[in-house]
Amino acid sequence: VDIGFKIRDAINIYYETNFQEDPTSNFQWEFVLVDDDQTKNAWCMPGGKIAFYSGILPILKNADGVASVMGHEIAHAVARHSAERASTAMVTDLGIMALEQFILGQRLPQAAGYVRQFGLDLPFNRKQESEADYLGLIFSNLAGYDIDESYKVWERMKEDMGGSGPSEFFSTHPSPDNRITKLKEWIPLVNAKYPAIST
């Protein structure tokens, strides 16, 4: 919980310092640990509700690992990814329904799901995940955590999954290998541009 509030405070100072409106100013922050040792996951809902499952803690290993995932989850909330996904899904469904009626004169119940999953949702979600990875690095670094731990978390996650994990084409997330590569590229840039701030 302290890690989440420390990152929250760093975000507040970041936006204040840059004379920008803080997108988290109306959030009701809540950090929950779900007692489930089998689930290795964390998630964020709009408005600052963040949950970690106890099963992910051995992979995170330390406060810097927790901060890397916490920063990532908070970044989803800051970037309002949930709202983006909902509006994209609605527009896609309406467009597919119109095409089905115009071209075929009937609805194909599975069509919208397949088009969204393989044509729009997956790449869009991977893009959001990459954005959250980058913003998460910034937020964690501003809060004073060691962001080198971010790619180490993914190395441990990859090992836990028994290799590289699912094919990136079929996944909403970038592959662990791609994530590790990108995080290693971004870390020196983030360290130089967004040093830790005093909270």
Model-derived features: positions:
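Peri-catalytic and regulatory segments of divalent metal-dependent proteins
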Residues: V1-M90, I103, L142-A143, G162, ...
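Short helix/loop segments within enzyme catalytic domains
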Residues: V1-P23, P109-T172, A196-S198
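Catalytic-site beta-strand/loop segments enriched in glycine and acidic/polar residues
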Residues: A51, A67-V78, L108-N125
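Residue-level signature of catalytic and energy-coupling elements of molecular machines
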Residues: F52, A132, S175
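Acidic/histidine-enriched alpha-helical segments
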Residues: A83-L94, D148-K158
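Membrane-active amphipathic alpha-helices enriched in small hydrophobic residues
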Residues: S87-L120
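Beta/coil-rich, acidic/histidine-enriched accessory regions frequently appended to metallopeptidases
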Residues: P166, F170-T199
